[in-house]
Curated annotation (Swiss-Prot):
GO cellular component: cell surface; cytoplasm; cytosol; Golgi apparatus; intracellular membrane-bounded organelle; membrane raft; nucleoplasm; phagocytic vesicle membrane
Gene: TLR2
Annotated phenotype, changing K714R: Reduced protein stability
Domain of life, per lineage: Eukaryota
SS bond partners: C30-C36, C353-C382, C432-C454
Record-given protein name: Toll-like receptor 2
LRR repeat boundaries on the chain: 54-77, 78-101, 102-125, 126-150, 151-175, 176-199, 200-223, 224-250, 251-278, 279-308, 309-337, 338-361, 362-388, 389-414, 415-437, 438-457, 458-478, 479-500, 501-524
Native source organism of the sequence: Homo sapiens (Human)
Induction pattern: (Microbial infection) In macrophages, induced by SARS-CoV-2 infection.
Length: 784
């Protein structure tokens, strides 16, 4: 029994492992380029079966806890390995021994509490290494990165347990493009630990407290170009001049991101910045100022020197007590050399006039996403304000009048570029006043419905995209670039109004087509972006766009954004791929040809009908059908006459005086139907003929030259022809009153001619002795 249980357990383990392995394989997908993706696939281990074909492997957000020596052994061509956000706590010493081609390694946010230099020794090609978010206290007992001579980006540290930076940690590293250290809970820093790195383009420091900040600053000031401080509380920061003996600084940009600061500590920070002789750019992102802007003027005048700072950027600055904020008059003297200022999304509603006047070197001012209105803007742009200003950005403020905005800015004599997009102007007056040197105006997303003469004619660049424009007819003789996408225009602007235009972006409008003539009218146009419109793919439009090879150089979004909207059977297809049929492209010629062919067919039919009496056949058919539709007064078997006699009026004497006398006076008498005597007056002749034939046992045709020539006889014979012969009966009796040639009988009476050729007919004898026999034969024929 124990043996049986043991076997069952072994089989269960094997089945479980096989299921897990098949699940791992199913969660990994690789393309032909060796890019394998298996992120968020609930993998418990690195899938087996990986070969040298794999070049990139993404196994992030899984449940991998262990990496063995054999997991990646065959991946000799692997260039990128991403294992972030797993549960990795153990990596065997030689796990990466075959990864000499690896360039990108991400082991962030796992459970690696101890780092080993043996992992990284084989990685001679590594340029990116991310070890953030692992619970190690230090960067190992020996230098981890001394063999990584090609390393460019390094990220180390964590928020909770990384407490110590040692001099050996960065030994061997001489140049890095980016170094990020999460030292949020740093408690110990060995001097000159970061000094071993000769050059770092961008250093990012996460530090909750500022205790060790000055020590680190001393080490990096001569090797770092851009220093970024994150998540730091500087409320109690105090600068000690004795802490720094270094004045030869390489730092050109200093960024404070998510930093807390007070009026006093900001003053201390500025004293620190004084030590950076080459500082050109200062940036504050998502910072909190727990103060009211009350900087001590005496200390500022004595200590603070703005140096060479040219660019100041402030984004999303939070001032809890902004309603008590000072006018910054204590900082006026520090602003005279600044050339570029950005204060974005920081609830700015006014720039004091005196401050504006002190910004003598300011060339670029960005006050986007604030609370500026025309009244306060007028105070900010007072006389002698911003004398050097060339670019002013007031995007997404609370401006409402174009006319007032333009008048307010007239004091800025050197202003050439104005961005007032994302304000709600709605309408545009007929005329406006603007600074005389204006070259660029951005009115995108301002809800305007039309453009007027308010637009200055000095413009070289105009952006009116994302509005409600359905017409653009401004004469702008100097305009070189027009951005008018996402409006309601149905055609390209008139080129004669824009003679200098180089760039036109008119995508996502209501344009359905444009022609070669329209494009050629823009003599200077170099770039056109017209995708995203609902194009009618007519033959002319397709011919123009598909045959012009040079058009692809002008249309920068060709061919992906040029889709057909109609005809319906090509909707959604790219214009360059659509092919229309000949009938769609040459409809006029096709219809003309069909009309000509139809005319010739009708003409030919007419000739044939005339030649072969087709009209007669149609008349007979119609007459017969009409007669057949009329109700009969007598049943088809109700015979009233022995014979219906068809004859010419010129032969009436023979019929009435000889034939009638011989037949009707015979005993028993024959009853004959004669049209002169028996037709019902006033009745349609067709009905009389048809009724008489149907009520007669036989039909006697008295043929003569007169019969053939008589219009009446032909008319009578026409309407009796179908009835006589459509059932192939023998009801016809032919009497040849005088010799006539068969050729004299019309061709259309084909059955009559056939009967004369195939059946015996009675011939009126000239000899009186033979006439008695004639009458005997006639009476016998009628009775048969």
């Amino acid at each position: 029994m124990p043996h049986t249980l043991w076997m069952v357990w072994v089989l269960g383990v094997i089945i479980s492992l096989s299921k897990e392995e098949s699940s791992n394989q199913a969660s990994l997908s690789c393309d032909r380029n060796g890019i394998c993706k298996g992120s968020s696939g609930s993998l418990n281990s690195i899938p087996s079966g990986l070969t040298e074909a794999v070049k990139s492997l993404d196994l992030s957000n899984n449940r991998i806890t262990y990496i063995s020596n054999s997991d990646l052994q065959r991946c000799v061509n692997l260039q990128a390995l991403v294992l972030t956000s797993n549960g990795i706590n153990t990596i065997e010493e030689d796990s990466f021994s075959s990864l000499g081609s690896l360039e990108h390694l991400d082991l962030s946010y796992n459970y690696l509490s101890n780092l080993s230099s043996s992992w990284f020794k084989p990685l001679s090609s590594l340029t990116f290494l991310n070890l953030l978010g692992n619970p190690y206290k230090t960067l190992g007992e020996t230098s981890l990165f001394s063999h990584l001579t090609k390393l460019q980006i390094l990220r180390v540290g964590n928020m909770d347990t990384f407490t110590k930076i040692q001099r050996k940690d960065f030994a061997g590293l001489t140049f890095l493009e980016e170094l990020e250290i999460d030292a949020s809970d740093l408690q110990s820093y060995e001097p000159k630990s970061l000094k071993s790195i000769q050059n770092v383009s961008h250093l990012i420091l996460h530090m909750k407290q500022h205790i060790l900040l000055l020590e680190i600053f001393v080490d990096v000031t001569s090797s770092v170009e851009c220093l970024e401080l994150r998540d730091t509380d500087l409320d109690t920061f105090h600068f000690s001049e004795l802490s720094t003996g270094e004045t030869n600084s390489l730092i050109k940009k200093f960024t404070f991101r998510n930093v807390k600061i007070t009026d006093e500590s900001l003053f201390q920070v500025m004293k620190l910045l004084n030590q950076i002789s080459g500082l050109l750019e200062l940036e504050f992102d998502d910072c909190t100022l727990n103060g009211v802007g009350n900087f001590r003027a005496s200390d500022n005048d004595r200590v603070i020197d703005p140096g060479k700072v040219e660019t100041l950027t402030i984004r999303r600055l939070h001032i809890p007590r902004f309603y008590l904020f000072y006018d910054l008059s204590t900082l006026y003297s520090l602003t005279e050399r600044v050339k570029r200022i950005t204060v974005e999304n920081s609830k700015v509603f006014l720039v004091p006039c005196l401050l504006s006047q002190h910004l003598k070197s300011l060339e670029y001012l960005d006050l986007s996403e604030n609370l500026m209105v025309e009244e306060y803007l007028k105070n900010s742009a007072c006389e002698d304000a911003w004398p050097s200003l060339q670019t002013l950005i007031l995007r997404q403020n609370h401006l409402a009048s174009l006319e007032k905005t333009g008048e307010t800015l007239l004091t800025l004599k050197n202003l050439t570029n104005i961005d007032i997009s994302k304000n709600s102007f709605h309408s545009m007056p007929e005329t406006c006043q603007w600074p005389e040197k204006m070259k660029y105006l951005n009115l995108s997303s301002t809800r305007i419905h039309s453009v007027t003469g308010c637009i200055p004619k000095t413009l070289e660049i105009l952006d009116v995209s994302n509005n409600n424009l359905n017409l653009f007819s401004l004469n702008l003789p100097q305009l070189k670039e027009l951005y008018i996408s996402r409006n309601k225009l149905m055609t390209l602007p008139d080129a004669s109004l824009l003679p200098m235009l180089l760039v036109l972006k008119i995508s996502r409008n209501a344009i359905t087509t444009f022609s070669k003539e329209q494009l050629d009218s823009f003599h200077t146009l170099k770039t056109l972006e017209a995708g995203g419109n609902n194009f009618i793919c007519s033959c002319e439009f397709l011919s123009f766009t598909q045959e012009q090879q040079a058009l692809a150089k002008v249309l920068i979004d060709w061919p992906a954004n040029y889709l057909c909207d109609s005809p319906s059977h090509v909707r959604g297809q790219q214009v360059q791929d659509v092919r229309l049929s000949v009938s769609e492209c040459h409809r006029t010629a096709l219809v003309s040809g069909m009309c000509c062919a139809l005319f010739l067919l009708i003409l030919l039919t007419g000739v044939l009908c005339h030649r072969f009496h087709g009209l007669w056949y149609m008349k007979m058919m119609w007459a017969w059908l009409q007669a057949k539709r009329k109700p009969r007064k007598a049943p088809s078997r109700n015979i009233c006459y022995d014979a219906f006699v068809s004859y010419s009026e010129r032969d009436a004497y023979w019929v009435e005086n000889l034939m009638v006398q011989e037949l009707e006076n015979f005993n028993p008498p024959f009853k004959l139907c004669l049209h002169k005597r028996d037709f019902i007056p006033g009745k349609w002749i067709i009905d009389n003929i048809i009724d008489s034939i149907e009520k007669s046992h036989k039909t006697v045709f008295v043929l003569s030259e007169n019969f053939v020539k008589s219009e009446w006889c032909k008319y009578e014979l026409d309407f009796s022809h179908f009835r006589l012969f459509d059932e192939n009966n023998d009801a016809a009796i032919l009497i040849l009153l005088e010799p006539i040639e068969k050729k004299a009988i019309p061709q259309r009476f084909c059955k009559l001619r056939k009967i004369m050729n195939t059946k015996t007919y009675l011939e009126w004898p000239m000899d009186e002795a033979q006439r008695e026999g004639f009458w005997v034969n006639l009476r016998a024929a009628i009775k048969s």
